């Protein structure tokens, strides 16, 4: 899923994707880096699949700092996990069946957000 999102963001839209999941901690606090990266983001994309706790923290921080209107959430149901966690299930997210659905369902939503930002609506 990440490879498809990365291609869409970087190749199709010419933007920089910052993947918080692959940032190394080094000699600094990864949380501090995560918070700075989210605060500096114009758009926030999150994969809610697998209900990873760190992603839930990132989504919460992005809601406060980026705003729901500039966020794109997607979720792929897996065995035993049919919906995102209850506290995110009420938010707008795109349900995908596999990585191919990212191109079909997620890319147009990302374009809508970018268009809204470009004209100052978001």
What do the PLM-derived regions correspond to, one by one?
Residues 14-15, 93, 119:
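Short aromatic/hydrophobic-glycine micro-motifs
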Residues 41-42, 63:
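Short, hydrophobic, well-ordered secondary-structure elements
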Residues 7, 11, 110-122:
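Defense-system signaling and execution modules centered on TIR/cGAS-STING-like, death/scaffold domains
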Residues 23-24, 49-51:
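Short, acidic/glycine-rich phosphate-metal binding loop used to engage nucleotide
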Residues 1-41:
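Conserved N-terminal substructure of TIR/SEFIR domains
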Residues 50-116:
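Cross-kingdom TIR/SEFIR domain
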């Amino acid at each position: 899923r990440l490879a498809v999102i990365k291609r869409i963001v970087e190749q199709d839209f010419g933007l920089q994707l910052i993947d918080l999941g692959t940032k190394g901690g080094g000699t600094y606090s990864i949380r501090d880096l995560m918070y700075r990266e989210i605060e500096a983001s114009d758009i926030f994309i999150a994969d809610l699949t697998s209900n990873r706790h760190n992603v839930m923290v990132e989504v919460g921080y992005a809601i406060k700092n980026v705003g729901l209107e500039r966020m794109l959430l997607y979720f792929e149901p897996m065995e035993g996990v049919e919906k995102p966690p209850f506290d995110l299930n009420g938010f707008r997210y795109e349900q995908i069946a596999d990585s191919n659905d990212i191109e079909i369902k997620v890319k147009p939503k990302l374009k809508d957000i970018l268009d809204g930002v470009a004209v100052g609506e978001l």
